[in-house]
Amino acid sequence: MQMIKKMVLSETFPGILLIFFTFLALLCKNSSLSVIYTDFFHANFTVGFDHFQISKSLDLWINDGLIAIFFLCIGLELKYEILRGQLKNIRAVSLPIFGALGGMITPALIFAAINYSHDFAMKGWAIPTATDIAFAVGILMLLGNKIPTSLKLFLLSLAIFDDLGAIVIIALFYTDQLSALAIIICLFCIFALLLLNYYHITHLSLYVLVGVVLWIAMLKSGVHATLAGVIISLFIPLDTKNKKPYLHEVLKDLNPWVVYFILPLFAFANAGIDIRDMHLGSVFSPVSLGIILGLFLGKQLGVFTFCFIAIKLKLAKLPENIKYGKFYGICILTGIGFTMSLFIDGLAYKNSDIFEHADKLAILIASFLSAIVGFIYLKIVK
């Protein structure tokens, strides 16, 4: 019993759990359990009453709702580090920003260079720009204490900026229309959160209430609802009026739910991709090559190059006691596009099968390559 408890509480267990549910989802989707698996996550659940109802399939409740809590946790951690931790220095916080820019621009250029002559294919230029923060964090958790906190923080920070960039891309290029009324409600909610923070109110129920309204408004606005989690994290106070830690207490309460429930459930709901009708030969099509080269090579090269240039120009600085070799390993992990890339793929091609699922297969290949190569590289390099 003691051994089981020790294993569950270890740093690597959440990562193992995430990988387990990823492969379980693939197994379910590619076996006789496929129909049960699909029906389960596509089952509709309605919350609300009378005219105030939200009806969504279970997988969307997970992707739009529960993952917002994950982003809340990441935002809280990032806020603490910027205000009191290792990112207090402007040059330290600018490093992941430059990395995120490089990680979006370079893959998009690679994809465009390969697919520029095909108008419909070019709709997917943003597919290789995404990083799946949940799975990247899962790989880091597998490595445990082999990865310094500063590098974990860099990946978390970069992934947040990367996802904010993805949300902007989705809003500008893949959203049919934005709801002005919903956006106005979002702004009112943000103002309410600002007041709560200004008056140093630490009643969590008030933040939850405003946060839920913000999440619903964001859901209706056309902007990705997970952004609500990041916004809420900006306004939760660091301390109580008596100078007792508050933000860390919230984070400590939420963290077990995120690593042991939300992330494994997210993996199980999203990793189920049917690969039975996919042909390996299709990976040599222009769209597939654009995605694979963009995600696997473009992400790591873009992140590293932009960061390296920023450091040399003294616009940013490498985390203390970190060598470029170890830093490059983290850059490799940013190529895990997986669910975020699949999400953008669905928006770009509207679930069209014109490419015979070669686009989805390419995302899987590039993401697994980035995960495996990044993991092995970080295990070897000191």
From Swiss-Prot:
Its main location: membrane. The keyword Transmembrane applies. One of its GO terms (cellular component) is plasma membrane. It comes from the Bacteria. It is a multi-pass membrane protein. GO terms for molecular function: sodium:proton antiporter activity. The keyword Cell inner membrane applies. One of its GO terms (biological process) is regulation of pH. Pfam families: Na_H_antiport_1 (PF06965). Disulfide bonds: none annotated. Coiled coil: none annotated. The chain crosses the membrane at residues 7-27, 58-78, 94-114, 124-144, 153-173, 178-198, 199-219, 255-275, 291-311, 327-347, 361-381. It catalyses: Na(+)(in) + 2 H(+)(out) = Na(+)(out) + 2 H(+)(in). It is found in: Cell inner membrane. Keywords: Antiport, Cell inner membrane, Cell membrane, Ion transport, Membrane, Sodium, Sodium transport, Transmembrane, Transmembrane helix, Transport. Belongs to the NhaA Na(+)/H(+) (TC 2.A.33) antiporter family. Na(+)/H(+) antiporter that extrudes sodium in exchange for external protons. This is Na(+)/H(+) antiporter NhaA 2. It comes from Campylobacter jejuni subsp. jejuni serotype O:23/36 (strain 81-176). The gene is nhaA2.
